Amino acid sequence: ISVTNNPEHIAELNEIKARYALELKSREDNTKRKITALRDKIQSNYEIWTHFITLTFKENVVDLKLAKERLKDWTKKMKLIFPEFQYIYVVEFHEKGGTHFHVICSMDPGKMVSNKKFNEVRRTWNWGTNTSGIDIKGINYKYVPKSKDSDKGELALKKADEKIKTIWSVGNYLTSYLKKDANATFLFGSKMYGSSTGLKKSIEITDPKKIANLEREL
C-alpha cells in the first residue's frame, strides 16, 4: 500500500506539519517578545549607561554554562571597581560554536572614568589574549576634532538627545544577536541574555523634540 495514498498516513503527516509550523511560530513570537523586552530595558535605563564592552575568549569556549560562570566572575570584579556597576549582556555565537559577550554597562555615571580605573577594567577579563579580549567603547562622550580655537581634539559630553540616539542604536545592535541566534537558544535551552538587578523595565518618552529626533533616526 502506498503511504502517500493512505488517508491515515496523510492525516498523520499533515498533523506533524501543523505541529511543526505551530512550534516555529511560537518560537518566533517568543523571540520577538524577548527582543522587545530587552530593547525596552536598555532604552529605559539610557541615563546610566556609560560604556559598551565586548568580551572574547582566547580559546573557543562552546560550553555556555562555563562562559556564563566566567562572565559572572567578571561582573564581581567590576563591582569592586564600581560599587554601583549595572549591566545588560547578550551572548553571541561564533561560526565555530564558541561564545563571546556584548555588554552595555554603567561605570561611574556622570563622571569620566580615570585612566587608573580604566586600566583596572582592562585587567578584569582573564580569558582573552595578552593584547585583546576586552574591547571598551564610551557612550557618554563624543570626540570633537581640533578647530581654529583648539590645537587638538577633545572629548565632549553628549547632549541628552545625542545619547538617546546612541543607546537606541546600541539596543538594536544587541537585540540583533537574539534574532540571529534564536535557533541556538532553542538548542541550548539557555537564556541568551541577562542583566543586573534594579534596572527599570520601561519608560515613556513624551517630549515632542526627543520623539521627533528618534523618529528621524529610525
Model-derived features: where do they sit?
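Right-hand nucleic-acid polymerase module
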Residues: 1-99, 108-218
